[in-house]
């Protein structure tokens, strides 16, 4: 990552620097202390570090796709100086294929999914790994059950793809989710 990209992140309106010591230039750690949920934190990083996303809304990852779509529609320019691209196909399987296609063109691609959506895109995930494509699959981990759908936390999404060949990084909190997201690119 170049120095100009790092400067853009910290000078962006996304990270307004307010508080004691800012006016005097005595900020020890640049950035903002803010309370946001995990989806918001991930999108703050993704929309700066990625070029394109293919996603189909599924709870609890729906917000990430919505926030990305809003940023793309508003003409947001990422740190590479590129406008964001968003594709919302007809299902999760197609979303994985779209994301793979975006990665094949050389774009920094991302996908947002969880639960049954991960299970549905399973075949496409193996194909992406087989082609050695690099993209980030942001998972809002949730449990999958046989009897009813639920949105309770769980690691079933992880176990669904643990043998697919994806590197999987787990965050213990919201800050770690943002940090690991940028590291994964």
Residue ranges and their predicted role:
Residues 2-160, 165:
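Thiamine diphosphate
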Residues 151-185:
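Conserved thiamine diphosphate
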